[in-house]
């Protein structure tokens, strides 16, 4: 049963975000919406809800269709509203009292603890705020559910919980979701739409298989274009040769033949379409200055504690060696970020290092945290690069342009940049530090899929030694060659991440 029919849809905001978009949404569809940051995913969802008028095309919806849209952020008027009330207020006022049981059902399905339900939204973590917005949307039982980056701010446990929740929805409820989490897309979708400025292909496959099909289609298109252009070139050469013979011999027949060959060449050239070339959001490059040290960090049963001294776990005897790409696994609150912080302190200020943590003196640290706190919101990208790395204005601007920063962006306060733009600036800062050891806490948080894959490639191509924390399962599987797990207040080495993923349902 067709619920939404999108025909020849296009939106132009300066440049075309997408055009000639055709999509039929049927009962039971679970559609993954994939595009780079700022390329129109949220815009398309806004067109479907009717809050944005497209530049061209039309959207037809089934009579009486209701659409639930879970946006990326909590509306400011709801900040002071308790979790439970924020969901209750989504019901019609005349039903709020008699139908309040529906709120309880939704909150139970999302495993929201009783204590959490009475807390104002502004006091909750980003992950719980996302779940509050999801509950607020679903309590009204919409016919179609739209989710915009639903895994943002969620830890692995909550991502697995959200996957289970989505897969337990009534089978006929269509879901359209935008996400950069490849494993999440694979677990929750059965169709994939790749949003592009011209043709936006759709595949009846989850992300990974759809991406393989897309890459093959693009490669086939590139081969066809190259073949057509070669044939056109040959036709033009034949036409030029015949033209010379025709002029010298005065043959009208050869002149006509020449014209026909040129027309065939023009027809081929006009019809030939170059293969899609993704416009990069900016290059991500890393560096590795190397070190002669074999062992970079030694842990001798160090106690990892909270700032007030509460023991989280003990490390046992562990070594970080050159070439290691260690992924630190553990539940939320186990102490992953705390260990990263203690390692950072031991490398940057050895005299203040905790007992049991020793870093080789030749280490040069490349550090990135999930909040990108190392980048001051009041500073500008151009100011950051010039001051930190003693480069001139022209060189700094060239570096920023290579990272995808326009002239306007370079002079903006960093606090006004998008998460993706800040992440790429952070990666440039890492590269210019020329480290030989990386400490990365949730490095893919604000990166689109292209950025994630580039970061994976750079870490492996440079044989960079690193210790990282990430809830991105695809990234962990691609990058890690050693895995440490925090379990029962001990740090233990495990063969791979799959056992941990399975334990949290991921």
Predicted regions and their residues:
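Flexible nucleotide-interacting loop at or near the entrance of a catalytic core
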Residues: 3, 95-96, 213-314
């Amino acid at each position: 049963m067709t619920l939404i029919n999108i025909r020849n849809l296009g939106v132009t905001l300066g440049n075309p975000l997408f055009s000639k978009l055709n999509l039929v949404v049927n009962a039971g569809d679970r559609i993954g919406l994939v595009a780079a940051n700022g390329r129109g995913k949220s815009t398309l969802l806004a067109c479907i809800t009717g809050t944005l008028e497209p530049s061209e095309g039309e959207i037809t919806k089934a009579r009486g269709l209701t659409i639930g849209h879970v946006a990326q952020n909590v509306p400011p008027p709801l900040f002071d509203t308790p979790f439970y009330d924020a969901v209750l207020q989504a019901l019609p006022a005349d039903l709020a009292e008699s139908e309040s049981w529906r709120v309880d059902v939704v909150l139970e399905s999302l495993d929201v603890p009783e204590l959490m339900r009475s807390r104002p939204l502004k006091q909750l973590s980003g992950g719980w705020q996302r779940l509050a917005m999801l509950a607020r949307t679903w309590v009204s039982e919409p016919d179609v559910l739209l989710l915009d980056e639903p895994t943002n701010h969620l830890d692995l446990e909550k991502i697995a919980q959200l996957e289970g929740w989505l897969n337990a929805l009534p089978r006929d409820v269509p879901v359209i979701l935008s996400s950069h989490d490849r494993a999440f897309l694979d677990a929750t979708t059965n169709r994939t739409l790749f949003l592009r400025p011209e043709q936006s292909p759709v595949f009846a496959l989850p992300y990974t298989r759809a991406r393989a099909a897309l890459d093959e289609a693009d490669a086939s298109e590139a081969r066809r274009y190259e073949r057509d252009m070669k044939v056109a070139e040959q036709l033009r050469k034949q036409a030029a040769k015949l033209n010379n013979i025709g002029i010298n011999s005065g043959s009208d027949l050869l002149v006509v033949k020449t014209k026909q060959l040129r027309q065939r060449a023009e027809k081929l050239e006009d019809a030939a379409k170059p293969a899609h070339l993704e416009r990069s959001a900016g290059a991500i490059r890393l560096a590795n200055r190397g070190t002669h040290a074999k062992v970079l960090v030694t842990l001798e049963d160090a106690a990892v504690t909270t700032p007030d001294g509460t023991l989280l776990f003990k490390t046992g005897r562990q070594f970080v060696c050159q070439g290691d790409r260690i992924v630190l696994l553990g539940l939320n609150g186990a102490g992953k970020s705390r260990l990263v912080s203690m390692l950072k302190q031991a490398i940057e200020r050895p005299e203040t290092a905790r007992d049991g943590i020793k870093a080789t003196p030749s280490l040069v640290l490349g550090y990135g945290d999930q909040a990108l706190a190392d980048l001051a919101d009041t500073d500008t990208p151009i100011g950051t690069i010039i001051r930190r790395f003693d480069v001139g204005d022209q060189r700094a601007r060239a570096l920023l342009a290579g990272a995808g920063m326009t002239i306007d962006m370079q002079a903006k306060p960093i606090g006004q940049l998008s998460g993706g733009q800040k992440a790429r600036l952070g990666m440039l800062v890492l590269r210019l530090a020329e480290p030989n050891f990386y400490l990365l806490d949730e490095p893919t948080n604000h990166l689109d899929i292209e950025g994630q894959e580039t970061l994976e490639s750079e870490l492996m191509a440079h044989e960079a030694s690193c210790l990282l924390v990430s809830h991105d399962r695809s990234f962990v599987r691609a990058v890690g060659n050693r895995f440490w797990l925090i379990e029962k207040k001990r740090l233990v080495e495990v063969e791979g991440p799959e056992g941990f993923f399975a334990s949290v349902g991921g």
